[in-house]
Amino acid sequence: MSWTVWQRSYKGPYFPFPINYVVLTSQPDGRWRAMVSGMDIEPLHPDFGARVTGVDLGAPLDGRSLSAVRRAIDDYSFLCFPDQALDDDSQLAFTRRIGEPEVDHVRFGRDGVVEYLSTIGNIEDDGSRRGNDHELTKYFTGNNMWHSDSSFRDVPTFVTITHAHEVPDQGGETEFVSARAAYGRLPEGPRHEIDPLIVIHDYVYSRSRVAPVKQSHADSLPPVEQKLVRTNPATGARNYYVGSHARCVVGWNEADSRALLDDLLAGATRREDIYSHRWRRGDLVIWDNRCLLHRGRLYDADRYRRRMRQTRIRGAGSTLQE
């Protein structure tokens, strides 16, 4: 196999100094990978996603490496760093280096407690396992619908950071699709039609379909308005912003709203465009909620343990101001 090698340099609003890429392109299949500030970045999917090696996220990263991670988020939307060994303190420290942590809405809404880490899976704080019939197991099946994290908040999530500690032998994958690629597949006419639209996102609307929402939780998350089409400030790439929390289009009736939002969601979640991530212990995955949709897949909670620690980073502000 032959390789063509060249260098690129990027300097943008997030980065005060150039980031040098050494890009290696294989011939003739066009597959390529990049060496960025000592990190080996290998694409996972034609539309998005990369596997990143050569970096220990539990160790302090210098400014150049952090800037390279931020740039890779903009370029790939999904980054998997395998074989990472972070405890809660180091994960939160890494999160703070990337941006402002987001308060876990479930713990705050249900109990009024401010926490920045949450557990994805069926393991309690004391190490016990919740089974399939547990109230919270049923409640969290809402994550099996296509969604973008915290799109129901006035300032939605920028990125989610999830570190796998225990994973089931079967099931429990997380599937991802790119709403950026889906927007690009739309003809020019429909793109122009949806560009100015505003959509109501509503947590109670989506979660009530799987389980009752505690009143204090509902009160903490009133419906919010979000732009239907978002633009990445660093790259200019555009995508539409939909998912299970998207209830209706502002100014449209329910039937027309539902028809449009369902059609856009279907266009983004075609089977051939899905990347299914099979979790391995030690995986640390960062995904960009501005442009990716994701959903969890079922696993047997009576048989398997699943424990992944998650932090989220707040967006820069309301999507209405983008």
Give names to the regions the model predicted.
Residues 20-78, 82-286, 290-322:
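Fe(II)/2-oxoglutarate oxygenase catalytic core
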Residues 1-2, 11, 138:
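Residue-level detector of alpha-helix boundary/anchor positions
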Residues 7-8, 28:
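Cationic, low-complexity basic patches in intrinsically disordered or flexible, solvent-exposed regions
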Residues 10, 14-17, 21:
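Aromatic (phenylalanine/tyrosine) cluster motif
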Residues 8-9, 183:
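Short intrinsically disordered, low-complexity segments
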